[in-house]
Swiss-Prot record:
One of its GO terms (biological process) is protein targeting to membrane. Coiled coil: none annotated. It comes from Dictyostelium discoideum. The chain crosses the membrane at residues 4-24, 40-60, 105-125, 221-241, 285-305. It holds the Pfam family DHHC. It is found in: Membrane. The keyword rRNA processing does not apply. Its EC number is 2.3.1.225. It is an enzyme of class 2 (transferase). This is Putative ZDHHC-type palmitoyltransferase 8. Keywords: Acyltransferase, Glycoprotein, Lipoprotein, Membrane, Palmitate, Transferase, Transmembrane, Transmembrane helix.
Amino acid sequence: MIDLFDFVVLSSFIILLPLVTDFLNNTFPNAKIGRLAQEVVGMILVFFIVSLIFAGVSLWYTHFLPFYYTKSLLISFDTLNLLDLLKFINTDNNNNSGSSIFNKITFYFHIFFTIQLVVNLYYYYYQTITADNFLPKISKNKQIQLFASETTTTTTTTTDNINEKKNKLCGLCDQVSDGKWSTINKPKSHHCRICKRCIDSMDHHCPFAANCIGINNHHYFILFIGYTVMALIYACYLSFFPYYHCIVNYKNYVSLSFTNDNDNDNNNNNNFKQLAQSCAKFNKYSFIFLCCCLIVTASFGILLFQTYLIITNSKTVQLLSRLKKSKSFLDWFKWLYQNFKQNASINNIYSLFPNFKFYNLIIPYYKRKINKLNK
C-alpha cells in the first residue's frame, strides 16, 4: 500500500522527468523526444504538482513542524499534529520563560508563513495553467476581406506589399487548419507545435503547466517558480532536522541512550533514548530532505534562467534557436554574454511586472490580461 512518503518520492521523480526530456529534445532536436513526452504527460504533471503541494502541507502539519519543536518529545504523543503542538506550547508558555515565549512567536510565524506560501503557490499555478495566450484566429473569409479592404483604402498598396502582409500569416497554422484559418504573426510570437496554435510573446511550452508561457502568464509563471523555490528552501530547513537526528547521528543517539556512566548523565541519556525512539517512529520520512534538495536544485536553476530572460527581455525559444545555430556551446555562451551586456536593464523587469507593490510579496499579484479581438 502506497503511503504519503512513497507518493512524495514518486512525485519528485515524475516532476523531474520533463527536464530530462527537454534536455534530450534540445540537444537532439530531430529525435523529438521532449515533444512527445509533453503531449502525453502534461495533465498528469499538473495533477502530481497540485497533489505534491497538498502532500507537503500534510507532512508539515503532521511530522516536520512538530518534530522541529519537540524532537525527543515526539514519542510522548500517539498522533502529534499542530493542535497537540499548540497545546504543548501554550502549556509550556505558562512558565513565562524566554525560550517558551520565543517558541510561541515562531510557531505563529510558521503558521502564517506556510499559509501565505500555499495560497500564493496555488494562485500563481492556477493563473499559469489557465491563461490563454493564443493569437486570434483569422478565417479565410476574414483574410480576403482584410486584404481587400487594405487594397481599396491604401492608394500606394502594391502587389509586393500585399504579399508581404500575407507572408505575415502563419503557414503552420494554415497547415493545421487545412487552410480554414490562420493567425497574423506578431513580434516574438511563435507557433507551438504542441498546442498547434501561435502564442503571443511565447517563451516556451511548459510541461509542468500543460500550457504555453506567453504574454498573459509569463509573470505568473516566474512568481510561481519563485515561491516554489522559497517553499522548497523552507521544506529543506524543516526536513533537515529529522534527517540529521535520525539518519546522520542516529547510531550515536542509540549508543548514548544505553550509556550510563554516572547519575548526572541519566537525564541526557533518557533524552537520547526518547529521540532514538522518535526516529524509529519517524522512519523513512527522514529521507524527505533529500527529495527537497533534489527538487530545489532544479527549481533554482529554472529561476536563474528565467531571471536572465527577464533582465535581457529575451525568450526561451529565442535562446534555443540561437543554440541550434551556434557551432558550439562556447559560441552560444559568448552570445548569451553579449546579449546580457547589450540588453540587460532593470526596466525590463518593471515592464513585465507593472504596478507590482511590496505587499504583493504576501498578497497575490494580479496583472490585467491583454484583450484579444476577433478571437
